[in-house]
Each structure stands twice: as C-alpha cells, then as structure tokens.
C-alpha cells in the first residue's frame, strides 16, 4: 500500500511541488522554488539522505514527506505533511514511525520540530507519537520608532566573526535557525552590521529584507558594559529607517532578545511550539 524513498538532488523539484501543495492552506504557507529550497537546505542542514517521500499504491503516487535536518546526533523535522485526501488513513503514523526507526538506526539520539501552536490536530499528533513541548517560540511585529539611533552601524561585517562563545557569554538560548551553524552555512542575502559606541564594538546585528518587510535574524551583544536593551532599542530604530514593517520570527521565550522585545511593546503575531523526542 505505502512505499518510502529517500530524497535526492534529482527529486528536489518533485519535493518542492509536493511540499507547496500540502502547505498551501497553512497559517504560514510554504512556497519553495528549487533555488529557495537549496538556500534553506544549506542554512538548516537539511540532509536529503535522511528525508523521506511517502508513495501510495502501485502507481507510486507521492502523498507525503518528511524533510529532515541533522547536526551531530540531533535530527530535526524541517517539514512533515500528508496530502489532505490521505489524512486520517494511517499514512501519517506510517511515515512518522518509519522516520523514527530510520533515524534511530542511523544513531541519532533526538528529534525536534516546530509546529504552529494553534494547529491543535498537529500538536496532538506529535504528542501521541511521543514528542514533548520543550518551549514556545514567538514571532514579533516590532513597533515603529523614530529613526534617531545614537550608535554607529558599519556594513559588511563578516558572519564568521560570530562564534558560539558569544552566545554563551550573553546567556542566549537560540533555536535551530539561530544556531551558529545556521548562520555560518547560510547563503542568503543577509546584512551584518557592526554596532559601535565611542569607537568600541558593542554588538553585531544580522538582518534581511523582503519586498514587504525588514526582519531581524539576531542581535549579538559583544560588550557587556552597555545594556542589551539599549542596544536592541537603538538597533530597531536604525532598521525602522528603511521604511518597512520590522519583524522577527520564531524567537524562543527563554532567550533574552524575546524578553526585551516583549517588554518594549512588540506584539506577538504567531506562536510555535518547539517539540523534542528522544530516539
């Protein structure tokens, strides 16, 4: 009835078409092109050899997928879905249990994912299959401020200047997409600014732009004589000067950047659960 195949570079266009179809009606629709998939593949450590496509019947109709990322002994479901007409048929359970078996056999110790908190059926499905909610991720709209920043912002700072010890010293709690591996591997057109006060570096900011928004990837404090909240307030004023709505997405609630944004008037427009399973 069901068969599974691993992903491959030759199947990328078929994978993106299937994923886009399944997620077209979701709160956050996915609209991958081959090019954007390859960018996400690099940034999020997607491994096609660990990703699976689910087929139905002798004609091998593609009906579902699990796109999987991997770092060390940790695996992550980047996206998981079944075509609408095959839901409630047992296909989801067949796929997820085969994913568990395959990853455990390959030596992975844990599997994590993010799911939109209002998608109660999806949340219940993952809980029934052994996942536990580890924390909540908030996406913010940051209020517009007058662009009267007091610090200096120099462009073309290298991403390679950000190291794991910077996050540790600042007591950060990054999610998968903000881990140093994601930042170093990313091929996306991000901007990196060095933030300076009185000829001294106090922080770095990684950010990007779309046609509709400016978005913060992260703000890294490198000098601890300046309050992190002051750095964030100034950085958001700087980014507001580009004249587009300012957002940041999937920010863990136990991360200091989340607390500063929340207490300074930013509004949550989406919440996700980060969930984890021991394999």
Please describe what each predicted stretch is:
Residues 82, 88-101, 124-128, 224-239:
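Conserved acetyl-CoA-binding loop-helix of GNAT-fold acetyltransferases
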Residues 53, 60-69, 76-81, 194, ...:
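Conserved beta-strand in the GNAT
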Residues 34, 129-212:
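Amide-forming acyltransferase catalytic core, primarily the GNAT-like/NAT-type
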Residues 112-115, 132-145, 267-278:
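Conserved catalytic-core motifs of GNAT/GCN5-like acyltransferases
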Residues 89, 93, 117-135, 253-270:
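Conserved active-site alpha-helix within GNAT-family acetyltransferase domains
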């Amino acid at each position: 009835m069901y068969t599974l195949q691993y992903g491959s570079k030759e199947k990328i266009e078929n994978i993106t078409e299937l994923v886009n179809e399944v997620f077209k009606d979701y709160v956050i629709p996915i609209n991958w092109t081959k090019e954007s998939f390859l960018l996400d593949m690099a940034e999020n450590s997607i491994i096609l050899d660990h990703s699976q496509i689910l087929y139905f019947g002798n004609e091998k109709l593609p009906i579902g997928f699990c796109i999987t990322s991997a770092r060390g002994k940790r695996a992550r479901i980047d996206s998981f879905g079944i075509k609408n007409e095959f839901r409630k048929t047992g296909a989801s359970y067949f796929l997820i249990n085969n994913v568990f078996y395959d990853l455990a056999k390959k030596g992975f110790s844990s599997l994590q994912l993010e799911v939109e908190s209002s998608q109660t059926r999806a949340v219940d499905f993952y809980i029934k299959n052994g996942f536990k909610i580890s924390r909540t991720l908030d996406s913010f709209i940051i209020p517009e401020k007058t662009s009267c920043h007091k610090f200096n912002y120099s462009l073309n700072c290298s991403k390679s200047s950000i190291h794991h010890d910077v996050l540790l010293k600042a007591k950060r709690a990054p999610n998968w997409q903000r881990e140093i591996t994601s930042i170093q591997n990313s091929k996306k057109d991000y901007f990196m600014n060095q933030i300076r006060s009185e000829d001294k570096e106090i922080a770095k900011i990684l950010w990007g732009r779309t046609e509709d928004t400016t978005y913060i990837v992260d703000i890294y404090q490198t000098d601890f004589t300046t309050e992190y909240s002051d750095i964030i307030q100034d950085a958001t004023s700087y980014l507001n000067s580009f004249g587009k709505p300012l957002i940041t997405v999937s920010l863990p609630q136990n991360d200091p950047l989340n607390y500063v944004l929340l207490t300074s008037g930013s509004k949550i427009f989406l919440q996700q659960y980060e969930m984890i399973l021991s394999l």
